[in-house]
From Swiss-Prot:
Disulfide-bond pairs as recorded: none
Keywords: ATP-binding, Cytoplasm, Kinase, Nucleotide-binding, Nucleus, Ribosome biogenesis, rRNA processing, Transferase
Keyword rRNA processing: yes
Protein name, as recorded: Adenylate kinase isoenzyme 6
GO MF annotation terms: adenylate kinase activity; ATP binding; ATP hydrolysis activity
Region feature NMPbind, mapped onto this chain: 33-56
Substrates-to-products reaction catalysed: AMP + ATP = 2 ADP; ATP + H2O = ADP + phosphate + H(+)
GO cellular component terms given for this protein: Cajal body; cytoplasm; nucleoplasm
Localization annotation: Cytoplasm; Nucleus, Nucleoplasm; Nucleus, Cajal body
Family membership noted in the UniProt record: Belongs to the adenylate kinase family. AK6 subfamily.
The enzyme's E.C. designation: 2.7.4.3
HAMAP family reported for this sequence: Adenylate_kinase_AK6
A GO BP entry: rRNA processing
Length: 172
């Protein structure tokens, strides 16, 4: 049976991981957090002194994920999306969060003032939504609100319906 690949993207702190893990547990699809994958496989290409974090080796991430993506049934969670092959994803969800809510979430994570402000600016200017629109066909890119628990439930329900329909349409 063919299964869809889903990309969850958006500014850090919008709820990609929470949504992705819950969606995987309810749908049976496999969840991959690219940050965790990179950490476990040490898929890095240097260190960013300004942001105090490792730099992702995008080519190695693609090599690591390619077979799984070809097999299908994968939910990928990452705050960037322009380096993934377009053919990988059947649908892309960009999570969006109000800046006041996002600020509190990032502050709780202990982000530096610069990192915090840069991520808030990223959300204000819809940087990741625009990146998704430039990287994938417009009709597969969807924005989802991610501010409160009720929206999480609505998003899960909406995506589960989409998965069910996709499976029907591609396995008859």
């Amino acid at each position: 049976m063919r299964l869809p690949n889903i990309l969850l993207t958006g500014t850090p702190g919008v709820g990609k991981t929470t949504l992705g893990k819950e969606l995987a547990s309810r749908s049976g699809l496999k969840y991959v957090n690219v940050g965790d994958l990179a950490r476990e496989g040490e898929l890095y290409d240097g260190f960013d002194e300004e942001y105090n974090c490792p730099i992702l080796d995008e080519d190695r991430v693609i090599d690591e994920l390619d077979t799984q993506m070809r097999d299908g049934g994968v939910i990928v969670d990452y705050h960037g999306c322009d380096f993934f092959p377009e053919r990988w994803f059947h649908i892309v969800f960009v999570l969006r969060t109000e800046t006041s809510v996002l600020y509190k979430r990032l502050e709780t994570r202990g982000y530096s003032e610069k990192k915090l402000n840069d991520n808030i600016q990223c959300e204000i200017f819809q940087v990741l939504y625009e990146e998704a629109m430039e990287s994938y066909k417009e009709e597969i890119v969807h924005q989802l609100p991610s501010n409160k628990p009720e929206e999480l439930e609505e998003n899960i329900s909406q995506i589960l319906k989409w998965i069910e329909q996709w499976i029907k349409d591609h396995n008859s």
